[in-house]
């Protein structure tokens, strides 16, 4: 299976530059150093998968000309990875259907606490008009499939919490990682491509 991977953002939780025009060690003269929060898009002939819904989601989807997604995978519930969830409403309107979200039980529980309204059905008076984002939660652990794409999920140490890494075909996306356990190391061994963000 051949997939196209688009990096929608590779910035830190504050983006680059951070508010206050803080560029850190990045050279502001290089336009590539203007970075949105971390997220990627994975596409093959039949399926489009988004990993993480950053606060920059609207701009990221506009930049990549995305008009539909088949699923969103969530690595963890820090604000820089889920606070774009409300922007799914506009995809709901275009696609005329709910969006499937895949995450661990703990992540789904935390998203439901913070974004409870996105899991509620549309009212009958709406006549199918998506006046709010509508998401269907799918709990994951280990291997699962989205259409024809096989995905392996695994837990990663993110300091005071965990994040979920995803292996798709011979590629893995490991965001916000402090360290890997032996199980994760076995999963990411002998890949063609590893995208990793160590934090």
Language-model features, listed with the residues they occupy:
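Binuclear metal-dependent hydrolase catalytic cores
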Residues: 1-174, 178-186
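Cap/insert and terminal regions of metallo-dependent hydrolase folds
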Residues: 179-199
């Amino acid at each position: 299976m051949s997939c196209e991977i688009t990096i929608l953002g590779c910035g830190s939780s504050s983006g680059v530059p951070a508010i206050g025009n803080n560029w850190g060690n990045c050279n502001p003269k290089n336009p590539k150093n203007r970075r949105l929060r971390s997220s990627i898009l994975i596409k093959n002939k039949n399926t489009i998968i988004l990993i993480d819904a950053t606060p920059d989601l609207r701009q990221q989807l506009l930049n990549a000309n995305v008009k539909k997604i088949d699923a969103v995978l969530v690595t963890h519930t820090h604000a820089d990875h889920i606070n774009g969830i409300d922007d799914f409403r506009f995809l709901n309107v275009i696609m005329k259907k709910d969006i499937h979200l895949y995450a661990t039980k703990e992540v789904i529980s935390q998203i439901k606490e913070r974004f409870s309204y996105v899991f509620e059905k549309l009212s009958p008076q709406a006549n199918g008009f998506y006046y709010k984002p509508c998401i269907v939660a799918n709990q994951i652990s280990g291997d699962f499939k989205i259409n024809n794409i096989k995905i392996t999920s695994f837990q990663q140490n993110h300091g005071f919490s965990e994040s979920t890494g995803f292996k798709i075909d011979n590629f893995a996306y490991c965001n916000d990682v402090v360290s890997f356990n032996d199980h994760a190391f076995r999963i990411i061994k002998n890949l063609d491509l590893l995208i990793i963000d160590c934090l």
